[in-house]
A protein has these predicted regions:
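ABC family nucleotide-binding domain
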Residues: 17-228
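H-loop (His-switch) and adjacent beta-strand-loop-beta switch element
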Residues: 225-237
Length: 237
């Protein structure tokens, strides 16, 4: 995919930093163990960071650890002053709801909810009053160019439109961290360009966007670059 996205605006200093400290993950295997991620220390200094590497290299392991979906064998993940892995499972879920947004290769929209209801869903879980969540959802859908599709079910949206709904849902809680796993993988070139344009906006606004991709053209759009191979993470300039 050759991406034609507008040149980035200057980065805004992030309000909350995402940091890893000697982060590692091993899994038992027969009589030994497999190291999926080796001691990784890094500060994600806002903007967009691409994570590239071959299949099975440890990219998904890193993303799951950053999100608190998986438990590290050692080290820490901090968002601001909070070590997310020191929280209980319920505490991590609540923390993610307030501070994280997620965009996956498959949009993962709830099939029986409209576009607007899907965007409202995280706000409903957070206890935001109905009127406020409706207003915020409509505003985000307008920002992603879907103000005329608010009442459509996911089955009545194109792949690109559904992914735009997913981005609106990811941003509606104003998260500090946005994690995106191959968000353009299932899309045609033009739809992919639209999605990348939308992902660069929060990066310019001081949010930390971590983007997993296999596409070098997509990775080149990021401000910072990480490469993962055999569990080793290197920072590329």
């Amino acid at each position: 995919m050759t991406a034609c996205v507008s040149p980035p605006a200057p980065l805004v200093t992030p309000k909350i930093q995402l940091q890893t400290d000697a982060l590692s993950r091993t899994y038992p295997s027969g009589d030994g163990q497999i190291t999926a991620l080796r001691s990784f220390s890094h500060t994600f200094a806002g903007g967009m960071t691409s994570v590239v590497g071959p299949s099975g290299s440890g990219k998904s392991t890193l993303l799951n650890l950053l999100a608190g979906f998986d438990t590290p064998s050692g080290g820490a993940v901090r968002v601001g002053d909070t070590d997310i892995h020191s929280l209980s499972e319920a505490g991590r879920a609540d923390f993610r709801l307030k501070h994280y947004g997620f965009v996956f290769q498959s949009h993962n929209l709830v099939a029986i909810l409209s576009a607007q209801e899907n965007v409202e869903f995280p706000l409903m879980l957070a206890g935001v009053p109905p009127r406020e969540r409706r207003e915020r959802a409509r505003a985000l859908l307008a920002q992603v160019g879907l103000e005329g599709r608010t009442h459509h079910l996911p089955s009545h949206l194109s792949g690109g439109e559904a992914q735009r709904v997913a981005i609106a849902r990811a941003l509606v809680s104003d998260p500090a961290v946005l994690l995106a796993d191959e968000p353009t993988g299932n899309l045609d070139t033009r739809s992919g360009e639209v999605i990348l344009e939308l992902l660069t906006r929060p990066a310019r606004e001081g949010k930390t966007v971590v983007l997993i991709t296999h596409d070098p053209d997509v990775a080149a759009l990021a401000d910072h670059h990480l490469r993962v191979r055999d569990g080793e993470v290197t920072v590329e300039r």
